[in-house]
Amino acid sequence: MQIIVNGEPRITQATTILALLLELGIEPKVMAAALNMNVVKKEAWESTLLQEGDKVEFLHFVGGG
């Protein structure tokens, strides 16, 4: 299916947010995710299904002082 990931079109076989992260080789522990402009809690990533045309945004947390 085709979705938008961080503003870029992407073809994916992933059906959930967690599967998409793993497909992209991204470490889930340090990420936040939004699906169609709605923040998705980490606990729901495995059960949140992706659909054709969805817009997914991943944000990486960086600590500092």
Model-inferred region functions:
Residues 1-64:
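Ubiquitin-like/PB1-type beta-grasp interaction modules and other compact soluble beta-rich domains
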